[in-house]
Amino acid sequence: KIEIKAKKIAHSLIELLDVEGLLAVEFLLDKNDNLFVNEVAPRPHNSGHHTIEANLTSQFEQHLRAILNLPPGNTKIKSPAVMFNLLGEENFAGPAVYEGFKEALELDRVYIHIYGKKETFPYRKMGHITVLSDTIEDATQKAIKLKKLVRVKSKQ
């Protein structure tokens, strides 16, 4: 029911805005199952970055196909995935220092993406990590452990 309502709202926005390419529509859901549009982005969006590894065609390729008037690619999921943002730690600001990468990269099917921002500050999006696994439950558990392990702090 909620998914159908979200799709209807998103389709209405697409038609209203006459978008060519991707249109990411981010919703918030309250405890009464009311949907609220939180963000509309006419571009690839952070919430779809997992498609880089998890889908046959990523959101980036889909966007290019759309604006170049090419047929859309297959969106089939290759693997269950969990993605989370790497955010600057609270109480840290300055040149970014990443902790826990070595340990994270020792794990199979873990993909770290750093956005190249030299300076961090609390809650700044500095990158993301995507975890693939055979089940969503296993990917979720691995992501929870990684979120505690990988940190973005600063030299100062």
Where are these regions (language model features)?
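Active-site "cap" helix and flanking loop/linker of ATP-utilizing ligase/carboxylase catalytic domains
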Residues: 4-25, 31, 41-93
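Peripheral (often C-terminal) accessory segments that flank ATP-dependent C-N-forming ligase machineries
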Residues: 65-156
